Amino acid sequence: MTAFVILHYRAIDTTRSCVRSIRALTGDKHIVIVDNASPDGTGKQLAEEFAASPDVTVLLHGKNDGFARGNNVGVRWVCAHLDADFTVVLNNDVEIPQHDFIPQIARIYAQNPFDLLGPDIVSVFSGIHQSPKTLHGCTLESVRHKRACVARSKNPILLLLSSGEKNSPAIWRLVQIRNRKKQHIDTT
């Protein structure tokens, strides 16, 4: 099963579109919407709307802790309550057009086991790949090593998963965390 964590803040129609695109995917899935303390009541609206949906859980987070912590709320919930093979963290403005997205993740994992998987960002205007390339899969150990190097560095590294092209289908901002052993990376 694949879990999808969506961070929600005020844009209810955008979140609904994201949920619709995930529901259209082939494969077993569960959607976790984390409302980041929307002041307009849209989080409560979503909770009521999906209350009878066994494939959607809405978490009403009491305060807006920002992007990373809000997503961590959802990832921690997945680790505690679901036996997911993969957890996909994405923005609520993302729609996934590939119906075989979930089997694609499983195929990639079977070919090259990974702990984190990011997108291949391709500009829709130029066709240029804007993603950093790596020759080997990313493991938790390599992430820990890089994190330790960054912690010792005087110049921290910031990774942005966006090409800056609004509404680009190539910008699906996927970060996948394997939680088979209930491991997670705390970005707080």
Go through each PLM region and give its residues.
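Active-site beta-to-alpha loop of glycosyltransferases that engages the nucleotide-sugar donor
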Residues: 6-17, 37
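Glycine-rich, basic loop-to-helix element that forms the pyrophosphate-binding segment
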Residues: 61-81
